[in-house]
Amino acid sequence: MSKQQVEIFMPPNKLKQKVGEGGGLDLNAVKRAEAAIEDLRDEFSDWITADVENLATAHEAYKTDPNMDNLGTLYRCAHDLKGQATTFEFPLVARVASSLCKMTDEGGDGGKSAPASLLSAHVDAIKVILRQKIMDPSDKMATVLASELERQVTVFLQKTAAR
């Protein structure tokens, strides 16, 4: 077999010229963002309290009139908490709210058959976690409660899927 000569052509890399030398993150911008978050920290308590009150109001409306609109409002309130509670330094509220979202969103009937007692248990757990100011994600009692709620939701969803 004869050897064939190969020429390798390396085109010039002009990406660096186009992008520039940039040093990555602007540490001053990061410090300003951290300072802004710290300034808002005092307001976090008010915001999460308002969000939990909205959840409780939506839950009461659903208990009074269990229709899909009220269930949708309950879901949206739980979804807001799921997304914001960790920022507000209440990761267990986020965890329980996530479980509530799962129950009201993933059921085959859109959550209509979710047991009222399980809905109430989620809302009550969120209110207690906030009232007791449980911010530690490893709090023994709250993690046991969150785990049990998640387990009950899994059981509910399995039953719903089997129908």
Model-derived segments and spans:
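Short, charged, amphipathic alpha-helical segments
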Residues: 68, 72-76, 98, 113-120, ...
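Generic structural signal for well-ordered, non-transmembrane alpha-helical segments
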Residues: 46-49, 53, 72, 79, ...
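A contiguous, mid-protein "functional segment" used to position or interact
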Residues: 31-36, 44-46, 58, 110-141
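Secondary-structure edge/capping motif, primarily at the C-terminal ends of alpha-helices
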Residues: 55-66, 85, 104-111, 133
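Long, amphipathic alpha-helical coiled-coil segments characteristic
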Residues: 29-72
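N-terminal leader/targeting peptides and immediately adjacent processing regions
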Residues: 1-43
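Structural secondary-structure packing elements that flank or coincide with functional cores
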Residues: 2-19, 122-161
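Extended, amphipathic alpha-helices with heptad-repeat/coiled-coil or helix-bundle character
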Residues: 68-107
